[in-house]
């Protein structure tokens, strides 16, 4: 049997592996792609941009573009002239994104300087969407946006490596139920949507529950006991196993509607039930009263918190259903072959 020819891919990532977006969309896939015969190189965008680092990155990207069969821009939105120059070296470009890059993060949405930067970024985004042979979106909301500019658009949800996310085996009893949240500090503003429900719940449930925040910055909520733990790169699963219920509040904004709900996927992967706002991809990931609860109002948040705090069997049952859904739809083991097929098709185009 003739051996399938190896495909060479260079990933131009927005961040290095310390940031979740690039880690989840690229770095976690690398061993799986390599086992399928791909040769992969990753070139993260420099965190501190100077004239020297900019030129070095440009020359490195052009060299790797000449080496590769496929160039993947992961969330990297840069000047048109650079995209056009790279496209002359290698026109087989894929653009992958997992955020509503046309609008600022909620924490900076009222900053006029940030908004001005995003007005420029939108033009760059539209350009690369039109120039890419293929676009990969993290959810259907993003895919619909990309379809305005690109003819070939695929959806691959942000996914977890099942081998790295073992099921939680030890559960708290009703004496101290831990509701947990893990994420970037700029997303702590999302607790605005759940704050009143949390306050009402803790007013009734008191010291028998707590909220644990895992991030690089703490959170303070009136009337809510919060325990803060500083996030560390290689301790994600340890943090998740310390929760009994995963929380994913979201403000109903354009940016939130474009997010891929990876927090909920992480919770479900280790067998945690989820309480989430019904915004964007959360409605596709969390099945109400099957893998968790969708809560919009303070009353709905309070009820969901109370039900899960009071019923260990319910927590375990919803958590098991969540893990099964992740195994079906949100695992790298399941989605790596889909990514491989797309890359091979672009390489041969």
Where are these regions (language model features)?
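A short, well-ordered alpha-helix in the C-terminal region of glycosyltransferases
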Residues: 307, 314-329, 335-341
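Conserved catalytic-core segment of nucleotide-activated headgroup transferases in glycan assembly
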Residues: 17-32, 159-165, 172-242
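Nucleotide-sugar-dependent
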Residues: 20, 189, 227, 233-269, ...
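Acceptor-binding helix/loop patch of EC 2.4 sugar-transfer enzymes
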Residues: 16-19, 43-49, 94-126, 161-163, ...
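Nucleotide-sugar donor-binding and catalytic loop/hinge architecture
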Residues: 2-7, 163-178, 328, 345
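Conserved acidic donor-binding segment of nucleotide-sugar-dependent glycosyltransferases
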Residues: 288-299, 307-313
């Amino acid at each position: 049997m003739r051996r399938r020819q190896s495909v060479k891919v260079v990933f131009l990532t927005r961040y290095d592996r310390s940031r979740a977006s690039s880690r989840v969309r690229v770095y976690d896939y690398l061993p799986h792609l390599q086992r399928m015969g791909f040769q992969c190189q990753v070139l993260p965008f420099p965190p501190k941009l100077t004239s020297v680092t900019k030129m070095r990155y440009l020359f490195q990207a052009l060299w790797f573009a000449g080496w590769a069969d496929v160039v993947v821009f992961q969330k990297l939105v840069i000047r048109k002239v650079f995209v056009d120059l790279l496209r002359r070296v290698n026109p087989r470009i894929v653009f992958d994104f997992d955020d509503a890059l046309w609008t600022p993060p909620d924490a900076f949405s009222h900053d006029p300087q940030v908004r001005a930067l995003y007005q420029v970024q939108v033009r760059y985004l539209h350009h690369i969407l039109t120039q890419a042979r293929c676009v990969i979106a993290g959810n259907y909301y993003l895919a619909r946006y990309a379809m305005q500019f690109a003819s070939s658009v695929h959806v691959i949800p942000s996914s977890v490596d099942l081998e790295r996310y073992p099921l939680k085996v030890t559960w708290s009893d009703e004496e101290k139920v831990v509701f947990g949240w893990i994420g970037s500090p700029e997303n702590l503003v999302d607790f605005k949507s759940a704050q009143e429900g949390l306050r009402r719940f803790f007013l009734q449930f008191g010291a028998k529950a707590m909220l644990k925040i895992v991030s690089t910055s703490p959170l303070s909520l009136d009337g809510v006991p919060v325990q803060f733990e500083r996030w560390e790169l290689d301790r994600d699963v340890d943090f998740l196993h310390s929760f009994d219920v995963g929380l994913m509040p979201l403000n109903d904004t354009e940016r939130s509607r474009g997010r891929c709900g990876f927090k909920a996927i992480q919770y479900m992967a280790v067998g945690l039930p989820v309480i989430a706002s019904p915004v964007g991809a959360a409605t596709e990931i969390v099945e109400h009263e099957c893998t968790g609860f969708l809560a919009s109002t303070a009353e709905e948040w309070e009820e969901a918190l109370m039900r899960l705090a009071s019923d260990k069997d319910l927590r375990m049952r919803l958590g098991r259903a969540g893990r099964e859904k992740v195994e079906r739809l949100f695992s790298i083991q399941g989605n790596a072959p889909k990514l491989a097929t797309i890359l091979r098709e672009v390489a041969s185009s």
